[in-house]
Every structure is written in C-alpha cells, then in structure tokens.
Amino acid sequence: MKKTMLLLFVLVATLSASAQYYPDGRPIPPRHRYGNNRGYHRGSSFDQFSDTYFGFRLGMAVATVHSDAANLDGSDSRTGLDVGVVAGKRITNAAPLFFESGLSYTEKGGKGRYEGDKFTYRLQYLELPLLIKYKYPVARDITIEPYAGGYLALGVGGKVKDYGKREAYSSFSNEKGSFRRFDGGLRIGCGASFDRLYVGMSYDVGLANVGHYDFEDTRTGSFNLHIGVTF
C-alpha cells in the first residue's frame, strides 16, 4: 500500500512538472492549452476545468472483510452496489488540482466458512469521501484523473447469514458476531473523463477495527468500478 501511494505521488509530481508555461514563466492554465476552445470541442457546453463540478456515479464494489477472528473473516469477496453523488472544487490556480467530496451508498462485506459452515456478510454504508484529484488533459475533452485521500462511513443496514445455524441477523449490533457501525480508511484511484462521461476505479483500505473484538482486528476492503456523468 505504501508503495502504491508513493507511485501515485510520483505520478502527480511528474504531471505537474510537465505543465506548459508562457514565455514569462507563468503556467498556462489547462483550459487554455488547446487554443480558443478552452479544452473542449466546438459546440460543447462543458468545461473540464471549471472551478467547480458536480456528478453522479454508479458502480459496483467487490468487497472483503479480513479478520483475525475466524468467525468474522469473510476474505472471499462479494459484489455489491455503489451509487452516489460527487462535488469538486478547484483548490489552486497553479495546477488542475481539485478537492472532491460527496455522499454514496455502498454495499461491502464478504463470505467464508467457520467450523465448516458457510456464512455471508452484507454491510451497507453511507460514505463520505475526502479526496484530492489531479485532472491531467491528454486531448480535447479527455482528462486522466488520479486521486487519493480517505473516506468516513456509517453502517445503515445489512445482514449476517449463518447457513449452518440457518440464522440471519443484523450486521450492526452489539453481538460478537456482528460489526461496529463506524468505519473509515484510505482510498486511491484513477478515473478518466470524456466530455461529460466519467469512468473510474478505486481501492479502499479500511483502517478502523469494525469488529467487537478489541484484541483481534477486523477491517474492510473493496475494489470499486464506476461510470457516471459530470456537470
């Protein structure tokens, strides 16, 4: 994980160093690098480098739960829904660097076996991302957008299913076989915008111990794919 974060930092630094400049040394804003079209094609009403943007994202999360406690270790992945809205604000005029946040509904969890019996976890969260994004223009209307940051999450629903005991109960309760509601972690990813269309992928690493066992760590993780539109 540390190597991945370092590679992303080097990538962003390299892209920043390759920025174009006016003869007097001032950086050329990305919106001006393609002449009078300001970075978007003739007839388009959307500017990739406006100071603010809003968007809708729809995708899937391939999630796991890794735990030192055998009855919580859902290290086999399960797939869930990931849908939400985002908003971004440019934070400097020296580079196309943005702060992005929003709100999403995400389904995480996992599946595995305990004492020979199958179990599954479905963990439903509301998530608040806190990200720094760099928009690098590669052609008119096309940007590559690496980002990194973190997220905060609140568990709002879900089920634990124990197929051996033929039982199902709430994912978030005070029971030893369930989970704490609050989660949070790191997020790293990269997207691409084609005019208003957005596609992207990200990886979440949970940092909070979401299990009720104080001496055995239980953490979530997920790989996410998204499509969406930006305004």
Which ranges hold each PLM region?
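Positively charged n-region of N-terminal signal peptides that target proteins for export
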Residues: 1-4, 20
